[in-house]
Amino acid sequence: MLDLLEFYLKNKETFVDDETPATSKGQYLHAKDIFKAKYFLFNIASSVFSRERNRTGLAQLLEPKDIIQGSLGDCYFLSSIASLVEYYPELLSELFMFDINPSGLYVVRLFNDGEWSSIVLDDRFPCVYGKPIFAKPHGNEIWVLLLEKAWAKLHGSYQSIDMGSSMEALIALTGAPCKFYRKEDDDTRKAIQEGFDSGSVVTCSGS
């Protein structure tokens, strides 16, 4: 991956991920009323955010407030990210192989099918009227958008991550085993308290 980055930096070229076509009819989307093709564009990060050093936000303090949900029902994934940011931000930072770079090439590591997978991304994001339509940052950081895009690419499309499991998301983000409890289960309250006491990441999601 480092050789790939060095190639684009040396040749001063912008990386374009051919596996993920930047069109509203590409593999990222399924037709839906909120996705109007004439308004929907993939804009590169530099045209959406002001140019700042460390725009991924990884060299700065990560906070849950950096995460804003957009027009996609992936709160299960975003809430899992928020929980990690709250308690173990260093684990989240380790998911990114590269920091901000002019080539627009990024690699996000996610745990999938029992092993870590490296998801190669460019810095084009779905936008409407020049603003991200899905996950949004609190400022100029793009780390939230990159994580969501990696999750979408892993599953084949943004549409396919519309609704899901917090447990699945946490496993992908940490590679650690997770347990699921329903609120009506007799041992749920005890399990939550034990989780907090042991320093485990605890999330709650509805359906």
What kind of feature is each model-predicted range?
Residues 1-207:
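Structured alpha-helical subdomains that flank or immediately precede key functional sites
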